[in-house]
Amino acid sequence: MAMVKMIAFVKRKAGLSREDFRRLWVEEHTQLSKVLGMKGYRINIALEPQPGENEPPYDGTAEIWWEDIESMQAALASPQNELAAADVARFADVLHFVYTEEFVVL
């Protein structure tokens, strides 16, 4: 059975350094999120642009997955998720979400 996944595209808050963005998200915010019944949680932080390249449109992505859609819906409707969602405002200005069904190929 395929896992249900939420993929978040995140732009850091204006004026926030890359280091503070990483710390607030990876070290602090994840502590609020760990109790949402998820089966996995991956954060990907964008690297500094190479010389001659533009800034990426997002500073990072998160992949969070659950066993099934009911588990995801219960987690997203929980009071704990309300706290986690409010905490995001400390480090992010822009969030876009895509909800997917994962198919592992390799």
Q: Positions of the model-derived regions?
A:
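Macromolecular interaction modules
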Residues: 2-106
